[in-house]
């Protein structure tokens, strides 16, 4: 599907973007390990999260939807059933990596595959430490790429240094640690998103966190988990697109409701404010052990270029392409480094952003681990290749709103991965 986005005069209104993708994934995966029933409200129904739901049903977990609420009957730590067929992970790296941790400690054989994009994404970063726990994982390129096979085995706890500060790696090892003998400790230089730790703590896991110069989390194996109730807040990664639009378009103001503001996730909003964005957190509260706010954003004509460093990346890794797009409208240079992780997302997001910006006439320099964007620049318009990557499609759709001649997005239907209603919601705030 191609989508043409034209210049608009302003956006206004209130919006509750879809629920958080990370928490929605974990609400299925982690509660399936519980001894008892869990209730999940406001579960995100999008491509990736529906993949998780379908995979866990195939593993024998009862997941029933009643009036928009999910009821998940946990099967305990090792009550999963051997799947009758290969598990299709679609486009979801989160589903794949966390499920590898879970399957490694079961008592059966399983096989996993995914779509063209997912089969090129690195799985060795999870498979290798799982193997050091005793997991039997094999597959393409010495077990580093899907398809992968997993033969469940007895696991032993390890100490692992998560040098990339990857939440998916950390979560996979913590899940495997639940199934292992002894303790598993994961240390990372900068804290990555911590929803897994928060949820496991709420479920009664024996989990301990240390915060010194680095961040460590230790979990003990074999303790029963309790079912819980989860009300999933709105996704800050989805809200970020509309916040960017409000900041860039004259006479705009927007209230984004019920947004997760966990400090491991709200880096985009903090950096946008540092650039000069008029952003305020209001009605701050707690929901399912997570901080939530309504975010007020309005047009901000005096944006300045900033520096994004390696330590900034974990809290905004999915929003860096969007921040790069905003940076085209900021005075001076915006320099992004330490973001090499973007090269192994749904697309090579550094390459995707740089090539598309250049094709639109924007002055940008590609770095091995980031980019340098020169501002402030006029956006004439043109054609954008989304590389079938939802975040590239949505990010350049926002740039289209300030383009002189409009921007045509190729494969715009990729937004279904995380935000099926994206264009519908965009029309709503434009019509206001």
From Swiss-Prot:
Involved pathway(s): Metabolic intermediate biosynthesis; chorismate biosynthesis; chorismate from D-erythrose 4-phosphate and phosphoenolpyruvate: step 6/7
Q: Which Gene3D superfamilies match?
A: Enolpyruvate transferase domain
What positions constitute the catalytic site?
318 (proton acceptor)
Show the coiled coil region(s).
none
Q: Which organism is it from?
A: Persephonella marina (strain DSM 14350 / EX-H1)
| Reaction(s) catalysed by this chain's protein | 3-phosphoshikimate + phosphoenolpyruvate = 5-O-(1-carboxyvinyl)-3-phosphoshikimate + phosphate
Q: What is its EC number?
A: 2.5.1.19
Instruction: Extract the NCBIfam families matched here.
Output: aroA
The domain of life for this entry's organism is: Bacteria
**What name has this protein been given in UniProt?**
3-phosphoshikimate 1-carboxyvinyltransferase
Q: Amino-acid biosynthesis: is it a keyword of this entry?
A: yes
Q: Which residues bind 3-phosphoshikimate?
A: 21-22, 26, 166, 168, 318, 345
> Under the GO molecular function aspect, what terms does this record hold?
3-phosphoshikimate 1-carboxyvinyltransferase activity
Q: Summarize the subunit comment.
A: Monomer.
Q: Which residue ranges traverse the bilayer?
A: none
Alphabetical keyword list: Amino-acid biosynthesis, Aromatic amino acid biosynthesis, Cytoplasm, Transferase
One GO biological process term is: chorismate biosynthetic process
**Main function:** Catalyzes the transfer of the enolpyruvyl moiety of phosphoenolpyruvate (PEP) to the 5-hydroxyl of shikimate-3-phosphate (S3P) to produce enolpyruvyl shikimate-3-phosphate and inorganic phosphate.
Q: Which family does it belong to?
A: Belongs to the EPSP synthase family.
The listed locations are: Cytoplasm
Gene it is expressed from? aroA
Q: Where does phosphoenolpyruvate bind?
A: 21, 93, 121, 168, 349, 391
Say if the entry is tagged with keyword Ligase.
no
């Amino acid at each position: 599907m191609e989508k043409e986005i034209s210049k608009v005069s302003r956006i206004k209104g209130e919006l509750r973007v879809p629920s958080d993708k990370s928490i929605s994934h974990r609400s299925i995966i982690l509660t399936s390990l519980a001894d008892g029933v869990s209730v999940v409200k406001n579960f995100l129904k999008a491509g990736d999260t529906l993949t998780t739901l379908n995979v866990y049903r195939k593993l024998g977990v009862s997941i029933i939807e009643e009036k928009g609420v999910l009821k998940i009957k946990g099967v305990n730590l090792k009550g999963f059933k051997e799947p009758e067929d290969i598990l299709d992970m679609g486009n979801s790296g989160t589903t794949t990596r966390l499920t590898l941790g879970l399957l490694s400690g079961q008592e059966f054989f399983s096989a996993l595959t995914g779509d063209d994009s997912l089969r090129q994404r690195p799985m060795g970063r999870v498979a290798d430490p799982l193997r050091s726990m005793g997991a039997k994982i094999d597959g393409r390129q010495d077990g580093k790429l899907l398809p992968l096979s997993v033969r469940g085995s007895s696991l032993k706890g390890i100490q692992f240094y998560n040098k990339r500060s990857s939440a998916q790696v950390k979560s996979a090892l913590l899940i495997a640690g639940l199934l292992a003998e002894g303790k598993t400790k994961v240390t990372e230089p900068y804290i990555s998103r911590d929803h897994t730790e928060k949820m496991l703590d709420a479920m009664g896991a024996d989990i301990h966190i240390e915060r010194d110069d680095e961040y460590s989390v230790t979990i003990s194996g074999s303790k029963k988990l309790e079912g819980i109730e989860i009300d999933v807040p709105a996704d800050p990664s989805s809200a970020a697109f509309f916040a960017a639009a409000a900041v860039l378009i004259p006479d705009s103001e927007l209230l984004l409701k019920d947004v997760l503001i966990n400090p491991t996730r709200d880096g985009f909003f903090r950096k946008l404010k540092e650039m000069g964005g008029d952003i305020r957190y209001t009605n701050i509260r707690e929901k399912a052990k997570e901080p939530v706010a309504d975010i007020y954003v309005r047009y901000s004509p005096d944006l300045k270029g900033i520096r994004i460093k390696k330590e900034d990346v974990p809290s905004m890794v999915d929003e860096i392409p969007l921040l790069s797009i905003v940076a085209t409208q900021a005075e001076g240079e915006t320099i992004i480094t330490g973001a090499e992780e973007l090269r192994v997302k749904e697309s090579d997001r550094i390459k995707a952003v740089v090539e598309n910006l250049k094709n639109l006439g924007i002055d940008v320099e590609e770095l091995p681990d980031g980019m340098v964007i020169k501002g402030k620049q006029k956006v004439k318009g043109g054609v954008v290749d989304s590389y079938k990557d939802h975040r590239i499609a949505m990010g350049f759709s926002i740039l289209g709103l300030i383009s002189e001649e409009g921007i045509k997005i190729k494969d715009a239907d990729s937004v279904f991965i995380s935000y099926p209603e994206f264009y519908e919601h965009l029309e709503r705030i434009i019509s206001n």
